[in-house]
Structure formats: structure tokens, C-alpha cells
Amino acid sequence: MTAHLLPPGIEVFERGWLSANNIFHYGKDDVSLVDSGYCAHQKMTLDLVSGAIKKHGLSALNKLVNTHLHSDHCGGNAALAEVFHCEVYIPAAEEAAVKNWDSALLSYDNLGQECPQFSHHHVLVPGEEIVLGRYLWKVLAAPGHDPHSIMLYQADHRILISADALWEEGFGVIFPELWGEAGFEEVAQTLDLIETLPINLVIPGHGAPFSDVAKSLATARSRLDYLASDPDRNARHGAKVLLKYRLLEWRSREIQQVNDWIANT
């Protein structure tokens, strides 16, 4: 339904919930990928990228861009960089944590998730622009789900890569609130920013691309009001999401191992 809304040179690899969507951009002078999925699925990510490069008669992957550094969005970074020797772009606010590979600052300890260590080459600064494939994209700050998250906006075709700031039926867990930091107001401000943009298509971090932005914003705001009215709801929701995510990765575990993971996360 949305394929015709994508201009030439953009392909969406819709994944699932364990791995974020990957957006493949290709043009004469640049081939880029936005987000790399979770490490447990890195072979699939490599196969998808290799297949797209072959299908379109390309020879390289030049850039790997991360909207944020939750492990479902950057878990394939190390593998992609090793195979394709691409340059890695991360949100500017995460630079020190990546340079020093601080798994606590990168939230992997708190979230009980894994991410193979990787290096970066460049940073993404809100307000600046970056060429991905054939088109110029503007970097937009999108705090809330993650304080350092960014979105990417293509003005000519009115496309927003929203990551986990907006899905068709909501948004990602507001993690900062779980460790006593602000998040609800930041989500509201990010939704307000999205509303100011002329948008024909949103490519979310999870789920299919969608075009009814007004409906999705209304759904997201309703969800935000529900969570913000009782912060314990957000905490319970976050805990359930983290457990479901881990179970998706494990598939099968002894109950004691699950209980141990819960106790240590």
C-alpha cells in the first residue's frame, strides 16, 4: 500500500520487534543504511543488505546511520562495519559513551540487552543535514523514548524516519522515566514537532510505513496521557516490554533463568 509513496532509491526492510526496521538508501554516489537491528539477527541484516546491493547493481555500503543506540537499532553495527567497511554515524550526544564503550551510559546494563562493541566515525547533530542515497535529509532531535534519539526528515518527498518517536499505534517505551529522568514532556514536545512537518509518509522503527499521520499522533497523545497520569503504568509497561523482548530472543528458558534475569535487571 505504501510502496508507491517511496521515491526511487529508498527501500524499507520491515523487520519485527526484536530488530528495528532497516532503511536502505541507494544512489549514484552514496549507499546508506539507517539502523542495523539486533545482534541476534545480524546474519539476516547482512543478508538483506548484501541482497539489496546485488539487486540494485551496487558495489558498497558507504554509511550506517543510527537514529539512537538501543540495541535493537544498532546491534548489527559491528558486523556491518566489519563486512562492508562503512562509516558509522551516531547521535552526537552518545559520542563519549561509544568512544569509552560505557555499557551503563548506553543503557544496555539497565535494559538487560546485548550489543557488540563498535566504533563510530561521525556524529549526527540536530539541525544539520546528511546525504543518504539520492536525497538530503535533515536531522531532528526526538527525545522522549531515548533522550538522545534523532529523526530524519526529507522535505522534498515529505518523508519522516521517526524511529521509535512515533509508530502507527503509539511510540517506544519512555525509558528515561524508569530511571527517574524526564520523559513524558519530551515525548509531547517531539509529537508537537512532528505535527509541524508536512508529511506524506512515516517510516517507523517498528511496523509498516504509514501515511495517516494525524490519526497516529492522536493515538500517541492518548497513550501518552494514559501513561503520564500514573507513572507506575509506564514502569509496568516498560518492565513487560523488556521481558517480552528478552523472551523473543531466548525462545525457550528455564523459569529459574528467567527469574534470575528479572532480579538482575
Language-model features: locations:
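Hydrophobic/aromatic beta-strand patches that form the interior of the parallel beta-sheet core
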Residues: 11, 65, 89, 122-124, ...
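Conserved beta-strand hairpin/beta-sheet module of binuclear metal-dependent hydrolase folds
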Residues: 2-56, 151-163, 168
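Active-site HxH/HxHxD metal-binding segment of metal-dependent hydrolases
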Residues: 40-44, 49-131
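Metallo-beta-lactamase
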Residues: 31, 38-40, 136-143, 147-228
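Short Pro/Gly-enriched beta-strand edge/turn motifs at strand-loop
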Residues: 4-10, 108-112, 133-135
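Accessory terminal helices/loops
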Residues: 195-201, 208-265
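Divalent metal-coordination and catalytic microenvironments
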Residues: 9, 25, 35, 68, ...
